[in-house]
Amino acid sequence: MRFVFIIALLLIGASLAHPADPIRAKRDVSASEDEFSGDSSGEISGESSGEASGEASGEASGEASGEASGESSGETSGESSGDEETSGEGSGEEGSGDTSPVVPVDELTLQQLETLNTYAQQVQAESQKLIHQANFVITEMTALSANAQNLGILSNIVLANSQMVLDSARLSLNETETETGTSAPATCVSSAVCYGDSGCGSGKCIGALAGTCNCNSCVFGWPCQEDSACGGFNGACNSITATCDCFAAYTKNNLTLAEALTSFCNVETCNGAEDNVEKCHGLPCNYGFCVC
């Protein structure tokens, strides 16, 4: 309390000591106003400068940080894309290394393509020809098979007829032997049972013990010393091989093989022994025909 009382007395004394000095009071008031304005202007200028500097620094820092972050992100993305391109190129090179190289189409000229096309058409035409030829061969084979079947049927008929003729000839031979009492037939009967050449007339008895008559007078490859062993065929006995060569005899007597088979052997007519040399070239005359 004492301290407060002392302060109050000092204030009262000060106010009473200078009441008549208005200039000084005005000076004091203006000084206080100046201090107040200085303080306020300082505070305002400080605040404005602080805000301006803060905004400038904020914008600068923002732009700097934005540019830095943009550049860093751009560089990072560029590097990553570069890495991806590098990896893509690497994978592409590795992948292409695994497969065979592909020749670009533009390396082939138009002339080469036309040549290949022409060659392909030729191959196709040749294949069509081969197909037609194969079809023709198949058709011919079918026709030959049918003809062979027909020939088989005809051969069976001929065999049956020949068997009938053979049986009739054997029967007539047996009757002749019974009537004449001789076993030597005047003529040769093909495939007749024989025990020697005498039982085959002009033919030969082929086979051991009971053989069969071979009425072919000239037997190819039959051993001989002269033409008489070859059925009397002129020039049939080959002196070098000592065997009968009937085909050479045809040539020596001016006959081709076709002529001998179609117009001479068993076709040329004869009357007997007197015709053997002229018409039958030494071969026997059997049943009125020259027998080869």
From Swiss-Prot:
Species of the source: Caenorhabditis elegans
Annotated segments matching region Disordered: 28-103
Keyword Transmembrane helix applies: no
Biased composition (Acidic residues): 81-96
Glycosylation sites: 174, 254
Keyword presence, Hydrolase: no
Keywords: Glycoprotein, Proteoglycan, Signal
Endpoints of the signal sequence: 1-17
Name of the protein described by the UniProt record: Chondroitin proteoglycan 3
UniProt feature, compositional bias: Low complexity: 38-80
InterPro entries named in the record: Cpg-3
